[in-house]
Amino acid sequence: MFIITVVILSIVIMSTIFALRSPTIENVYEISVIVPDSSNNMWNRFESGVREAMDNENVIVNIVNTTGMETLADQKNLIDKEIRNGTDGLIVEFIASNDTEKVVDDIVSKTNLLLLNTKCAMYDIDLKQVDTVTLDDELIATTLTSQLFDQVGRDLRFKRVGILANNIDQYSMKRRLNTVEDILDHAGAKIDWIVSGSSSEMEEQLKFVDIPNYVIGLNSVSLDSGIDFAKKYTIPLYGIGGSDQNVNALDEGIIQSMLVPDAFVMGYNSVQLMVQRIKFPHERKEEIIDFFTINKENMFSKQNESILFPIGD
């Protein structure tokens, strides 16, 4: 009887050990997100998508606080910290596009990487291990100028335009800016000024610029910076955005038309694609995110409400 009891107990113990070691029990992967100005509410809709994907994929996602991150070196320090902490993958929007080659090489030698909103000026490196989730910057910039033309016509001779371009150290912003400049030039418009920098820097510069006929903002931060200026001088404001301030200004009629990237899908797909790479290494994938043209008249349609105010936002 004693021998039988010992045998049964041994079987139970071995079964328990096997269960604990069983490969069918999945690991909970940890993913880190490092984007500029992460505390800005322009990321709220992106974070909603991240949270839903996190629940569906059963992963942990850490959106790193990037307050005070002003240079690529600052960002690299945060990246290194996450790698030391054992992150399984990094979702990164670089604060600057130049000189990123070595940073990318270093990251992919240590963990998985997905580039967000980043078409870096790094054509000489192997991108096979780097997925991207991004906008088509030329398309969205072209569509933005079309919105202006739809309202004021295509002949902009003798018209002056001001452009707010936030961070021109990012390749994506340069693409938008160059596209808008080329189209406006062909339409005969005079570009009065191009203001860039942080939100506070742009607001300060706007105190000293000439008053144009139209203002264009090339991202959420740019639009935020131009709202008070446009309201003060009753200037039509157009742009690419989606922050809470942007949406309020659209509702008030300060922003005439706004192109809103589907940030929820961007967040969701970024996490989903990263999980796929962690589990099943694959050839490089690039996903292009849609955007929507929204104005005061259509902002509360069923589709546009879901873009501006996603569930859980």
How would you describe each model-predicted region?
Residues 32-48, 53, 62-72, 95-97, ...:
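Extracytoplasmic "Venus flytrap"
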Residues 99-139, 243-251:
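Flexible loop/hinge segments that line or gate small-molecule binding clefts
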Residues 131-158, 242, 246, 261-279:
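Hydrophobic alpha-helical segments within soluble ligand-binding/sensing domains
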Residues 2-17:
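Hydrophobic membrane-insertion alpha-helices, especially the h-region
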Residues 62-84, 192-210:
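Structural motif
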Residues 42-57, 140-144, 168-189, 266, ...:
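Short, solvent-exposed amphipathic alpha-helices that sit
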Residues 94-109, 113, 194-247:
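Hydrophobic alpha-helical
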Residues 265, 269-313:
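Hinge/cleft segment of the Venus flytrap/periplasmic-binding protein
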